UniProtKB/Swiss-Prot annotation:
Keywords, sorted A to Z: Repressor, Ribonucleoprotein, Ribosomal protein, RNA-binding, rRNA-binding, Translation regulation, tRNA-binding
Domain of life where this protein originates: Bacteria
Protein's recorded name: Large ribosomal subunit protein uL1
Pfam families registered for this protein in UniProt: Ribosomal_L1
A single GO molecular function term of this UniProt record: structural constituent of ribosome
UniProt cross-references to InterPro entries, sorted A to Z: Ribosom_uL1_bac-type, Ribosomal_uL1, Ribosomal_uL1-like, Ribosomal_uL1/biogenesis, Ribosomal_uL1_3-a/b-sand, Ribosomal_uL1_CS
GO annotation, biological process: regulation of translation; translation
Length: 231
């Protein structure tokens, strides 16, 4: 059996197996256990009572986290005319049409979010095989295909997270950084949970939010007592 590292021993000594943690207690414990030199992300995994094999039970959407993600988000926008000027004014890092598509085909994909106005989809449609696998393909269901590109840019810059159930019916999202105050992480998670509950499929039966787990990039996963969350 492999020996535990010093960090693993510290985690094992602090984390109680089988315990459900109050949210703020969990957030504080993750910060205490963080000894990594870089600023870790704090992530949430939410197990939903859905059957993701059924198309009407796939849960997807977007939430603007009230306290942001702590990340500098780079945004590219496919649009033209007055909408292009509005997107730039809203803080977009790059705006264009065919020339932007050519840049992306050439490998310039240093963006976290790609947004498009409906009239630009003729151009964006050529990039499906490039943007799709990276999770960057604009989609009206999460607000990244919209005539109001300026608002979409502002939302992305403000810390909007996009989510979709994976093959196991789990939602994964980054909800901040390890140096966030626990209350700010809690507010972000509550905003996400509120939207997930609003999007509950009518065909979903039984318990909808089955399990909530909070973790950091290099830290343990802590199961959250849902009674400690107001959502």
């Amino acid at each position: 059996m492999a020996k535990l590292t010093k960090r693993q021993k510290a985690i094992a000594a602090k984390v109680e197996a089988g315990k459900q943690y109050g949210f703020e207690e969990a957030a504080a414990l993750l910060a205490e256990l963080s000894t990594i030199k870089f600023k870790e992300s704090v992530d949430i995994a939410i197990n939903l009572g859905v059957d993701p094999r059924k198309s009407d039970q796939v849960v997807r959407g977007a939430t603007v986290l009230p306290n942001g993600t702590g990340k500098d988000v780079r945004v590219a926008v496919f649009t033209q005319g007055p909408a292009a000027e509005a997107a730039l004014a809203a803080g977009a890092d790059r705006v264009g049409m065919d020339e932007l598509a050519a840049e992306m085909k050439g490998g310039d994909l240093n963006y976290d979010v790609v947004i498009a106005s409906p009239d630009a989809m003729r151009v964006v449609g050529q990039l499906g095989q490039i943007l799709g696998p990276r999770g960057l393909m604009p989609n009206p269901k999460v607000g990244t295909v919209t005539p109001d590109v300026a608002s979409a840019v502002k939302n992305a810059k403000a810390g909007q997270v996009r989510f979709r159930t994976d093959k196991n019916g789990i939602i994964h999202a980054s909800v901040g950084k390890i140096d966030f105050e626990p209350i700010k992480l809690k507010q972000n998670v509550e905003a996400l949970l509120s939207d997930l509950k609003r999007l509950k499929p009518s065909t979903s039966k039984g318990i909808y939010v089955k399990r909530v787990t909070l973790s950091s990039t290099m830290g343990p996963g802590l199961v959250i007592d849902q009674a400690s969350l107001e959502a």
